[in-house]
């Protein structure tokens, strides 16, 4: 059995050693970040675009802001995508924007081919 430091069982077991106070402090920090991002996003825009798998992915995983990865084209046989991040509890607007962008880019029906 693989018992390297990077093996998922060992990584998972490390979470058992997090003291409760550190967990609570991290959750409080997450809440502050969530509130700041919520205030920032309730400005003049409904959503924003970011490269797929950018550093904001970690942020939205913590804050709960919805993120939608959409197709933006193909380079040969390699698909390209972009992430659209929306306001809290506003997934409907995010989906409508994603559909409009894919439609405008004429990529909504493009699928990569797979050799089987």
How should these model regions be labeled?
Residues 94-116:
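Short, gly/Ser/Thr-rich active-site loops of penicillin-recognizing serine hydrolases
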Residues 1-34, 71, 75-81:
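Short helix-loop capping/hinge segments that flank enzyme active sites or metal/cofactor-binding pockets
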Residues 46:
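Conserved acidic residues
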Residues 32-43:
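Short, well-structured alpha-helical segments in soluble
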Residues 81-88:
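A short, well-structured catalytic beta-strand-centered motif of the EAL phosphodiesterase domain
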Residues 60-62:
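Short hydrophobic alpha-helices that are characteristic scaffold elements of the AMP-binding
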């Amino acid at each position: 059995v693989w018992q390297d430091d990077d093996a998922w069982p060992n990584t998972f077991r490390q979470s058992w050693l997090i003291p409760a106070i550190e967990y609570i402090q991290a959750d409080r920090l997450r809440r502050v970040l969530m509130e700041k991002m919520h205030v920032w996003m309730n400005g003049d825009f409904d959503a924003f675009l970011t490269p797929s798998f950018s550093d904001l992915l970690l942020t939205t995983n913590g804050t709960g802001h919805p993120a939608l990865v959409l197709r933006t084209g193909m380079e040969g046989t390699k698909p390209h995508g972009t992430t659209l991040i929306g306001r809290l509890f506003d997934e409907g607007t995010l989906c409508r924007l994603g559909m409009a962008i894919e439609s405008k880019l004429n990529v909504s029906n493009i699928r990569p081919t797979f050799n089987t």
